[in-house]
């Protein structure tokens, strides 16, 4: 048995589209995870302030889109500062998924806050999916960094990274994470429905299939965190939701580097954190079999190229 890392995967409901109340929920979940002995907590995609599910039936709802913009999070806001203060009070590494407001634009963002309260990684979703592009923009950052090194009590320094939702459909993105020697991966997902409505990749089994494949191919632990959507219709009483987003089921889970699920399934209405202990030797065992950025690679034949275009709005020469 190797060194252990105890983690907390959030399967919880936000206070839908209410920035201040959802940040309070974030702080409560951080405290809960810390009190359960976790050293890292992983939050779903845009947990703050919740996923705007109406875009899948009425993306041109300008009033709601404005409301959503006003309830999105900025790094310099009192709400974000309160999260930092909570981390300092309850020292735990945090991977936060949120709708980021930057001036007049929104982005699907993730950040990693270490257990001292320092922001050690900021990233934005590479490309919003389908109708998400009505609300959120592409990242304009040419920096492909998605992994940082965090320190844990028993395991010492460990590479931790994150991606959002269908970024896990992008093989080059997870190869990029593998090339940064990621050991613990956080996959942040929105409210998901466990019904099979004819599109398998929109089911729990389909989403978990992506997670299993990622864990196996990158040889990392995969923390699957998704928003609980039991009360989403109550928050949008006059909206006809897409059947894919009605009463979203909790899909929280942890997958080992061989793709096996190491947490039990929780009820659809379980609201809280799922605790799991990771045995870091499992990574070494899997790497011994296959290492796609090591002994099982041929960079002399196949490699990933990363373009670094200019992303400045004004260039002064």
From Swiss-Prot:
UniProt-listed PROSITE patterns: CN_HYDROLASE, NITRIL_CHT_1
Query: Could you tell me the keywords of this UniProt record?
Result: Hydrolase
Q: What class of enzyme is it?
A: hydrolase
Span of domain CN hydrolase: 5-280
Q: Mention one GO molecular function.
A: nitrilase activity
| Reactions this protein catalyses | a nitrile + 2 H2O = a carboxylate + NH4(+)
Look up the signal peptide feature and give its range.
Answer: none
The protein's superkingdom reads Eukaryota
Q: Which residues form the active site?
A: 45, 125, 165
InterPro entries documented for this protein: C-N_Hydrolase (IPR003010), C-N_Hydrolase_sf (IPR036526), Nitrilase/CN_hydratase_CS (IPR000132), Nitrilases_CHs (IPR044149)
Enzyme Commission number(s): 3.5.5.1
- Report if keyword Hydrolase is assigned: yes
Gene3D superfamilies to which the protein is assigned, alphabetical: Carbon-nitrogen hydrolase (3.60.110.10)
Q: Which SUPFAM superfamilies match?
A: Carbon-nitrogen hydrolase
Task: State the function annotated in the UniProt record.
Answer: Nitrilase that hydrolyzes preferentially 4-cyanopyridine. Is also able to hydrolyze some aliphatic nitriles, such as phenylacetonitrile.
Family, according to the entry, reads as follows: Belongs to the carbon-nitrogen hydrolase superfamily. Nitrilase family.
Q: Which PANTHER family match?
A: ARYLACETONITRILASE (PTHR46044:SF14), NITRILASE (PTHR46044)
Name used for this protein in its record: Nitrilase
Provide the species name. Meyerozyma guilliermondii (strain ATCC 6260 / CBS 566 / DSM 6381 / JCM 1539 / NBRC 10279 / NRRL Y-324)
């Amino acid at each position: 048995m190797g060194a252990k890392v105890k983690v907390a995967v959030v399967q919880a409901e936000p206070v839908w589209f209410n920035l201040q109340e959802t940040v309070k929920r974030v702080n409560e979940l951080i405290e809960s995870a810390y009190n359960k002995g976790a050293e890292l907590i992983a939050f779903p995609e845009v947990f703050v302030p919740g996923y705007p599910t109406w875009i899948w039936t009425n993306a041109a709802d300008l009033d709601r889109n404005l409301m959503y913009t006003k309830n999105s999070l900025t790094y310099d806001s009192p709400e974000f500062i309160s999260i930092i203060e909570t981390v300092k009070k309850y020292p735990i590494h945090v991977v936060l998924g949120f709708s980021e407001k930057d001036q007049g634009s929104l982005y699907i963002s993730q950040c990693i806050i270490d257990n001292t309260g320092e922001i050690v990684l900021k990233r934005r979703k590479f490309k919003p999916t389908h109708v998400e592009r009505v609300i959120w923009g592409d990242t304009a950052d040419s920096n492909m960094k998605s992994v940082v090194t965090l320190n844990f009590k028993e395991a010492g320094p460990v590479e931790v990274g994150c991606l959002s939702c269908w970024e896990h459909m992008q093989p080059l993105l997870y190869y990029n994470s593998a090339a940064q020697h990621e050991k613990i991966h956080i996959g942040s997902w929105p409210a998901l429905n466990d019904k099979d409505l004819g599109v398998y990749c929109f089911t729990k089994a389909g989403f978990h299939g992506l997670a299993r494949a990622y864990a196996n191919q990158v040889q990392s632990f995969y923390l699957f965190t998704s928003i609980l959507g039991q009360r989403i219709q109550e928050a949008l009483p006059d909206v006809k939701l897409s059947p894919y987003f009605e009463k979203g089921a909790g899909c929280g889970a942890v997958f080992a580097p061989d793709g096996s699920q190491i947490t039990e399934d929780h009820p659809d209405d379980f609201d809280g954190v799922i605790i799991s202990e990771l045995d870091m030797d499992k990574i070494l065992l899997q790497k011994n079999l296959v290492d796609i950025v090591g002994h099982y690679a041929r960079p002399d034949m196949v490699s990933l190229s990363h373009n670094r275009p200019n992303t400045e709005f004004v260039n002064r020469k």
